[in-house]
Amino acid sequence: MAFLKKSLFLVLFLGMVSLSICEEEKREEENEQEDDEQSEEKRGMFTNMLKGIGKLAGQAALGAVKTLAGEQ
């Protein structure tokens, strides 16, 4: 009977350790996904900012060309 108790406790202990390791890995994966999502958002914001800057620069250049063309 004592052998069965020890075996049962060993199985339960190993199961709990395995479950704990799986939960830890799951948390790490979730954190990595959150980090990936945040970096994608930053990348998207940076891209939009560059597009806006490019648009403003293009408009300024076009305005300068129109001004120069109007003076001649």
Curated annotation (Swiss-Prot):
Keywords: Amidation, Amphibian defense peptide, Antibiotic, Antimicrobial, Cleavage on pair of basic residues, Secreted, Signal. One of its GO terms (cellular component) is extracellular region. Residues 23-41, 71-72 form a propeptide. GO terms for biological process: defense response to bacterium. Residues 30-39 have a biased composition (Acidic residues). Residues 1-22 form the signal peptide. Its main location: secreted. Belongs to the frog skin active peptide (FSAP) family. Dermaseptin subfamily. Possesses a potent antimicrobial activity against Gram-positive and Gram-negative bacteria. Probably acts by disturbing membrane functions with its amphipathic structure. This is Dermaseptin-A4.
